[in-house]
């Protein structure tokens, strides 16, 4: 298999898989302290064998806008995901933002 389709978009299957682990809402100092105290052995192994970095959050500091910024490289004003929920005007209900069609730009993938 050389390609895969996700949410209606085609992607090349990576030659070398990449895994991104996001500690949402976690101050990097918590991780540093846990590593120093030796209570995060799996994170320590990941750090030793891969890449570890901290990212600046976008505003608003909700999960979906930040994850969208990670995969697009642009702020919420560009990609269009400004929260975890939106008000569906047709039904008057709050809906969780999970539909890839709501993205206004491509990804870095």
Give a label for each model feature:
Residues 1-17, 25-109:
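Active-site nucleophile/metal-coordination loop of metallo-enzymes that catalyze phosphate/sulfate
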Residues 22:
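Generic enzyme active-site microenvironment
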């Amino acid at each position: 298999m050389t390609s895969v389709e996700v949410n209606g978009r085609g992607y090349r299957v990576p030659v070398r898989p990449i895994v991104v682990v996001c500690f949402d809402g976690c101050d990097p100092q918590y991780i540093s302290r846990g590593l120093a105290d030796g209570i995060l052995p799996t994170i320590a192994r990941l750090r030793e064998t891969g890449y570890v970095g901290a990212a600046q959050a976008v505003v608003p500091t909700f999960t979906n806008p930040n994850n969208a910024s990670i995969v697009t490289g642009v702020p919420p004003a560009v990609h269009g995901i400004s929260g975890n929920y939106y008000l569906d005007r047709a039904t008057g209900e709050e809906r969780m933002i999970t539909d890839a069609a709501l993205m206004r730009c491509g990804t870095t993938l």
